Amino acid sequence: MKHPKILSILLLALLISAGISWDQFTHPDISSEGAVSLPEKEIHIPATAETPPAPALQAKYACVMDSISGRTLYGKDMDMKAPMASTTKIMTAILVLESGRIEETVCASSYAASMPKVHLGMQKGYQYHLKDLLYSLMLESHNDSAVAIAEHMSGSVQEFAEQMNQKAAELGMANTHFVTPNGLDAEDHYSTASDMCRLAAYAIQNREFCALIQAKSHHFSTIDGKHNYSVSNKDAFLSYYEGALGIKTGFTGKAGYCFVGAARRNDTTLTSCVLACGWPPNKSYKWTDTKKLMDYGFTNYAPLVMPVQDLTALRIPVEDGKSSFVSCQQPDEIHTISSRSEAITVIYEIPEKLYAPVHADTPVGNISFYINDTLYCKENIFPSESIEKSVFSDTIRNVLHLWMENFG
């Protein structure tokens, strides 16, 4: 124990000569001098308007959603499962477009040719360009084209439906299940108004999809040139509503009239869905309801960037670190949409000090964003750099430990 004693005595002499007290090491702490904290740990922006009245709708199920943030602006039984008729074909089209196979040749089967109206009128053995069948599918909602596409893409309708369901799961469509590629009434074929809004928001990110649904007409023929076809866009929403991007209508005896729509004005893009929106002769209900939903969204909501203080100006004390302070990375902007009737609250959770080692990829705190007291999202706060633990500090503690063992 001779050498440890000598080291301890030398250390003690060094500390005394440097004017450093024993208590600074037996009860380690760092000075808060030089630390910079946030001006406010909580920011509250009050509402400045009354809650807008809900739109009066004919549809049993409805939803309008901000396509960028995915925030629901209004819903009417929007998570109730219901048949969605030919709005199903949105998913069918997206799977084809994302496959990169639109130049392939499709041969119609007898099963595809047997599909009821609305249909293209294909016969067994007819061959088409896959791209042409997409126009048939989305402009005039042909059921035979949907089946021919599904069989070509996956070998069977059943296998294609599995791909549809896999994609739905990826998109967070938790209350959706596909059985057919065309939306004809089938057991266990259903979705919800909110899920279909999510699908529409995803679909309109695809430029080819947008070009497809906005085409006024398309002319094509079978591969051999013997049979010619002309299809025109049946989506009246395109001319009915300012800023309309269109998307897809639907009707079956079980589903009633349905429509999934999208519209853009300035920096806001909304998607909407109405299901079970009347039965014959009330064909126009889907248009008036969709207009009400879109008007509700565009009139009462506007884009918002959540307020965040400058975290790069922070100086958080670091205990036992090679650096005494660390700042924080500025998080990415949080974009959403909000109404003047909604209060915004931002709460910061940041420690008063940190203990080395500090890792730049490990969060040291978080920011919670609330809309009307409901948590909207939570973002992690990361340090601006990694801070290693001080080796000198460890050495001193080891020597002090020996001192305590021998003289304490």
Question: Which residues make up each language-model segment?
Answer:
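An N-terminal domain-start capping segment
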Residues: 16-18, 26, 89, 399-400
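Generic detector of short alpha-helix boundary/capping microenvironments
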Residues: 6-9, 50, 57-58, 80-81, ...
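Basic side chains
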Residues: 2-5, 76, 89, 167, ...
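Domain-terminus/edge residues, biased toward the C-terminal soluble/receptor-binding domains
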Residues: 2, 22, 174, 187-190, ...
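Sec-dependent N-terminal signal peptides of Gram-positive bacterial secreted proteins and lipoproteins
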Residues: 3-24
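N-terminal hydrophobic or amphipathic segments with adjacent small-residue motifs
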Residues: 13, 64, 115, 119, ...
